[in-house]
């Protein structure tokens, strides 16, 4: 198949290199801005094309050798070929550029990204056991790039040492039981041991983790941030942005087991945590009791439905609101947040696009974006965590403008 030469100019939202040929964008796998490469087209769409590198003619100064032997086949990482500094610069720039195109940033301060270690940071993983269709060999590892095949993994440089040790032990036990029916098995490196999803856990041995001097239990198969170091930084940034005191009432939406709620409780008069999953509410209540946090109260509610009739919402006044929804965001919920008349809102998200959408809605209710930051929760992947702080002004949104950048 014919090859063409292209210079890579930027990165797409998913970390692919982007060049242009005959006025059309070309998305090139594992390409870095500054690369000049001979490429082969692998897919054509009306407005863009997709390609793979055949040969590098000139390498970008930001290009590095991938450190994992499975990088070319494993679907876990997307950016190991890009230096860690360049990764973080791209993630921050991509977020701030998208934000500035959508909302008023004239009064917004862009804070320097929160960063930490980029190896051995993952305390949670989801693995797959099964036999591949092609060679019928039993494998235990991660899904391959762009397919349901399994990449057999003995060690992952992003996992904590304890997880890698547990992974090797688990392989011996499960590989003889592999079949064509793929089985997902998750594992977490908790502060009190290794917990596998296929092993029963009772209340006396719930997994736990620490944050801000507190110990929080969580369900063995439930959510916990994969990066303990960055979670601590993120919680402390939220506390700083909330600007708390002992006279305040705070509402924590999508509170989980109390990751933000209980650190907030240490600094305020009252904090109310709302979560959709009953088992997480019960776990949060347990964590509050264990920590003697009488200031914290938890309720179960479907936050994707109308919550205005709920007692914790109706005719209530909160000084601060924090929300940390999943990837789908909280658009419907944000439509009613103005009724609470909170002076400040801190929004935490693993999906920049839904955060931006919801910030636009909060602008309509008289809130102004004051601070934004990228949190590098997932180094060497195209994923990131982002945060925004808004204050109540009562004014309608003005025209968009650039923020105050501190990269």
Curated annotation (Swiss-Prot):
Active-site residues from the entry: 350
MF terms (GO), sorted A to Z: 4 iron, 4 sulfur cluster binding; iron ion binding; RNA binding; rRNA (uridine-C5-)-methyltransferase activity
Residue intervals of the TRAM domain: 1-55
The keyword Mitochondrion appears for this protein: no
PROSITE patterns the UniProt entry points to: SAM_MT_RNA_M5U, TRAM, TRMA_2
Gene3D superfamilies: 2.40.50.1070, Nucleic acid-binding proteins (2.40.50.140), Vaccinia Virus protein VP39 (3.40.50.150)
Protein name in UniProt: 23S rRNA (uracil(1939)-C(5))-methyltransferase RlmD
Designated gene of the protein: rlmD
């Amino acid at each position: 198949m014919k090859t063409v030469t292209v210079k890579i100019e930027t990165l797409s939202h998913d970390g692919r290199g982007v060049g242009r040929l005959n006025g059309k964008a070309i998305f090139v796998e594992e390409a870095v801005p500054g690369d000049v490469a001979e490429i082969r087209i692998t897919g054509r769409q009306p407005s863009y094309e997709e390609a793979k590198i055949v040969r590098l003619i000139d390498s970008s100064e930001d290009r590095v050798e991938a450190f994992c032997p499975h990088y070319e086949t494993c679907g876990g990482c997307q950016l190991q070929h890009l230096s860690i500094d360049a990764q973080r610069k791209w993630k921050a720039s991509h977020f701030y550029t998208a934000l500035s195109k959508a909302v008023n940033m004239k009064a917004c301060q862009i804070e320097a990204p929160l960063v930490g270690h980029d190896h051995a940071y993952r305390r949670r993983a989801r693995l797959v056991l099964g036999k591949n269709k092609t060679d019928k060999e039993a494998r235990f590892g991660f899904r391959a790039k762009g397919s349901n095949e399994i990449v057999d993994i003995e060690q992952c440089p992003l996992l904590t040492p304890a997880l890698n040790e547990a992974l090797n032990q688990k392989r011996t036990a499960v590989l003889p039981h592999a079949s064509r029916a793929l089985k997902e098995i998750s594992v977490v490196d908790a502060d009190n041991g290794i917990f596998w999803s296929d092993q029963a856990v009772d209340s006396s041995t719930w997994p736990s983790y620490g944050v801000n001097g507190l110990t929080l239990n969580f369900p063995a198969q439930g959510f916990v941030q994969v990066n303990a170091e960055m979670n601590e930084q993120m919680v402390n940034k939220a506390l700083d942005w909330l600007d708390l005191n002992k006279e305040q009432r705070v509402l924590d939406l999508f509170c989980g087991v109390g990751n933000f709620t209980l650190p907030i409780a240490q600094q305020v008069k009252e904090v109310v945590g709302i979560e959709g999953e009953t088992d997480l509410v019960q776990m949060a209540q347990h964590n509050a009791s264990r920590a003697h946090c009488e200031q914290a109260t938890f309720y179960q509610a479907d936050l994707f439905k109308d919550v205005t009739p709920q007692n914790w919402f109706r005719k209530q006044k909160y000084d601060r609101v924090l929300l940390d929804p999943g990837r789908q965001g909280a658009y419907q919920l944000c439509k009613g947040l103005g009724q609470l008349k909170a002076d400040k809102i801190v929004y935490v998200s693993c999906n920049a696009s839904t955060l931006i959408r919801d910030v636009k809605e909060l602008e309509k209710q008289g809130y102004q974006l004051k601070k934004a930051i990228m949190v590098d929760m997932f180094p060497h992947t195209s994923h990131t965590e982002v945060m925004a702080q808004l204050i109540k002004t009562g004014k309608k949104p003005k025209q968009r403008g650039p923020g105050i950048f501190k990269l």
